[in-house]
C-alpha cells in the first residue's frame, strides 16, 4: 500500500484524519439543493473545517471561529443554517465552545472542598455518597444492573414456591399415613 496517497502521511499524530481546507461546489445539483435552505445565498466555495483535527490546533480554530462570526448575521460561511443545527449537534465532530470554555475554567480553578465541588459539579450529591457506609452491601450493589439477574430471581422464587408446596404435600402425606395406621390398629384391637 502506498502511504503517500493518504492524507497527512508526514504527520503520524494526524494519520488518516480529515484535512480538507475547502471544498469547491461546482455541481449544478448541489447549487440547486443549497437554494432550498433558509438564507440559501451560499458562495460557490464553502469552507469546511474539522474541529477534531489535533489537540493543539483546536484552540486556534475556536479562536478564528469566534473572531469570524458576527452577531448580526444568522448564517455565515462558518455556521450551518438553523435547520441544520440539531444535525450538527448530534455529529461527533461538533464541538460546543461554551462547554469547552467551562471545562478549561474548571481546570484553572480546582475545587478543594466538598462544598465547592458540590457547587461547581454536575454531580451535586457527593456529600450524600460520602455519608453511605461502604461496609453495607447495598452501597456496592445500589445502581448496578446485571443482565439476567431479574430472571434469576424469578427462577429462585419459583423454586422456593415449588419446594414449599412439596414440603406441604409431604407433611400432608405423613399425617394421612399416620391417621390410616392409627385407624387400622384401632380396628384390629376392637
Swiss-Prot record:
Keywords from the named record: Deafness, Disease variant, Endoplasmic reticulum, Glycoprotein, Lysosome, Membrane, Non-syndromic deafness, Phosphoprotein, Transmembrane, Transmembrane helix
Effect of residue 117 to A: Compromises cholesterol recruitment to the perinuclear region
Glycosylated residues, chain numbering: 109, 125
Modified residues (Phosphoserine): 79
Gene Ontology biological-process annotations: angiogenesis; cholesterol homeostasis; exploration behavior; gene expression; homeostasis of number of cells within a tissue; inner ear auditory receptor cell differentiation; inner ear receptor cell stereocilium organization; neuron apoptotic process
Tissues with expression: Highly expressed in the auditory hair cells.
GO molecular function: cholesterol binding
One protein family per Pfam: MINAR1_C
Membrane-spanning parts: 169-189
Compartment annotation: Lysosome membrane; Endoplasmic reticulum membrane
Disorder this protein is connected to according to its UniProt record: Deafness, autosomal recessive, 120: A form of non-syndromic deafness characterized by congenital or prelingual onset of severe to profound sensorineural hearing loss. Sensorineural hearing loss results from damage to the neural receptors of the inner ear, the nerve pathways to the brain, or the area of the brain that receives sound information.
Record's protein name: Major intrinsically disordered NOTCH2-binding receptor 1-like
Amino acid at each position: 500500500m502506498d502511504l503517500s496517497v493518504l492524507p497527512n502521511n508526514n504527520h503520524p499524530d494526524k494519520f488518516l484524519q480529515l484535512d480538507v481546507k475547502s471544498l469547491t461546489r461546482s455541481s449544478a445539483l448541489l447549487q440547486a439543493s443549497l437554494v432550498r435552505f433558509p438564507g440559501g445565498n451560499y458562495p460557490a466555495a464553502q469552507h469546511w473545517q474539522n474541529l477534531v483535527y489535533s489537540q493543539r490546533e483546536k484552540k486556534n480554530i475556536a479562536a478564528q471561529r469566534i473572531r469570524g462570526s458576527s452577531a448580526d448575521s444568522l448564517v455565515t460561511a462558518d455556521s450551518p443554517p438553523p435547520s441544520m443545527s440539531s444535525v450538527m449537534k448530534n455529529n461527533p465532530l461538533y464541538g460546543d465552545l461554551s462547554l469547552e470554555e467551562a471545562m478549561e475554567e474548571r481546570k484553572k480553578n480546582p475545587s478543594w472542598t466538598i462544598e465547592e465541588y458540590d457547587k461547581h459539579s454536575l454531580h451535586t450529591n457527593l456529600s450524600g455518597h460520602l455519608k453511605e457506609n461502604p461496609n453495607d452491601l447495598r452501597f456496592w450493589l445500589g445502581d448496578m444492573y446485571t443482565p439476567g439477574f431479574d430472571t434469576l430471581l424469578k427462577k429462585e422464587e419459583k423454586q422456593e414456591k415449588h419446594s414449599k408446596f412439596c414440603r406441604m404435600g409431604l407433611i400432608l402425606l405423613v399425617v394421612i399415613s399416620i391417621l390410616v395406621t392409627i385407624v387400622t390398629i384401632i380396628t384390629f384391637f376392637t
